[in-house]
A protein has these predicted regions:
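N-terminal low-complexity, intrinsically disordered segments
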Residues: 49-71
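Core alpha/beta structural scaffold of self-assembling particle/tube/pore-forming proteins
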Residues: 1-52, 73-413
Length: 413
């Protein structure tokens, strides 16, 4: 005779549902919240005069000849940056009370879409002007091309792309939809392996199909967030890579309109290198950066380097006090006092950035946020689906005066 147990009498036992687990992804953003946001960007463009030299002739012994300063005009154009979510109407109705679901479908999607948008915004601010990553034929220590492609893009045989040395794990999340080069077809990220710098993709791609099993991704080909090729604002990776003669916001890059970039040539980070970077920026502008951001890799090295300057802010468990506790980090002592140093998952492994957030502005058109012009944020989809769609975001661009910021690149990893 069988005993009465959870198997033989399965229908009589309830399922004990507990609260959802903590999110298993990193949403920390120690940069965006410190930037200046302006929500009055109307008109076709925003033009900002730049002063690149002194004005007025000076001299002794006789009256000097006057001169006019060197002026240029920075031109800022808005970019369309979106986050969207879709919710099936049945799911909305099925989640209207706690007996039907852990959370309301609309509330869950609203929260997760804002999280995803903020992640993409941070990627843009620190990015290279569009690329999700340069999965390309980068050179490794052995001098051979690193990127290889295999697979067929199906769920059972996904494209497997081994990325180059500038791979950033944070650029990809499972379930992301991305484009390869200029293709409009969507590729779903199904797996990310940071250790091997490998991503797996499911979807249709003529370009990847032609490369599968035959060779690396060309140096001119990249992956992009959906529709982002040529449409992202310039980020700090792109700004730091500019050379004299190129332009940023329409202003010619030269010694007065250029980020201070020091090449470590494969050496490890040392205090002298940080001091040199900060003093070079102060020498040019009279201002010292007020924030340093680096990759996790460099942060580990900095923790060992600044053993006597470590300072941690441990957040209180009690929510009543959390607002009074700042983001945890390390302080680096500059000529103008301590500067907070944070790790940022969107910084390249071999880089450290020094920012002055007083000279980084996000210029928004009015009405940034959820698109609710029709009185509601959830609109019925027009393609016949029994579903609703909501859009978050707006029209903005970042204006960073490059001379007030700096970077150390090619640090030992």
């Amino acid at each position: 005779m069988a005993s009465y147990n959870t198997t033989t009498a399965n229908a009589m036992f309830k399922i004990n549902y507990y609260k959802p687990s903590e999110r298993l992804y990193n949403t920390a953003d120690p940069l965006s919240g410190r930037l200046v946001n302006k929500n009055d960007f109307t008109g076709r463009s925003r033009n900002l005069p730049t002063y690149k030299s002194y004005s007025g002739g000076v001299g002794s012994g006789s009256k000097p000849v006057g001169n006019v300063a060197s002026y240029e005009e920075a031109v800022l154009l808005r970019k369309k940056i979106y986050g969207t979510c879709e919710v099936d109407r049945e799911a909305i109705k099925a989640s209207e009370n706690s007996a039907g679901a852990f959370v309301k479908a609309t509330k869950e999607q609203v929260m997760k879409t804002v999280e995803s948008y903020n992640r993409n915004k941070l990627r843009i601010i620190l990015g290279n002007g569009g690329h999700a990553t340069a999965a390309r034929d980068s050179l490794l220590g052995n001098g051979n091309g690193s990127t290889q492609v295999s697979g067929a893009g199906t769920s059972g045989n996904p494209y497997v792309v081994v990325c180059g040395v500038d791979f950033k794990e944070a650029s990809f999340e499972e379930k992301d939809f991305i484009n390869y080069d200029a293709e409009v077809s969507l590729l779903e990220v199904t797996e990310v392996d940071a250790a091997t710098k490998t991503i797996k993709l499911v979807g249709t791609s003529t370009g990847l199909a032609s490369l599968s099993g035959s060779g690396p991704v060309p140096t001119t080909k990249y992956f992009y967030m959906q529709g982002s090729k040529g449409n992202d604002p310039f980020g700090f990776k792109a700004i730091s890579d500019l050379v004299n003669g190129q332009t940023l916001y329409g202003v010619t890059v030269d010694r007065k309109w250029k980020m201070q970039v020091n090449d470590a040539l494969g050496q490890g980070i040392i205090v002298d290198a940080l001091n040199e970077l900060l003093l070079q920026i102060e020498k040019k502008t009279g201002k010292v950066p007020n924030m340093i951001q680096c990759s996790y890799t460099q942060y580990v090295k900095v923790l060992n380097l600044l053993e006597d300057q470590k300072q941690y802010n441990l957040p209180a468990k009690d929510s009543r006090f959390k607002a009074s506790v700042s983001f945890s980090g390390v302080e680096f002592m500059s000529t103008k006092g301590p500067i907070p140093l944070f790790y940022n998952r969107f910084v390249e492994e071999d880089r450290i950035y020094a920012f002055n957030d007083n000279y980084i502005e996000i210029h928004h058109a009015p009405g940034f946020g959820w698109f609710d012009d029709d009185g509601t944020i959830f609109m019925r989809k027009s393609n016949g689906d029994d579903a609703y769609e909501a859009t978050y975001g707006g029209y903005w661009n970042m204006y960073a005066q490059p001379t007030f910021h700096g970077c150390i690149k090619n640090l030992a990893i």
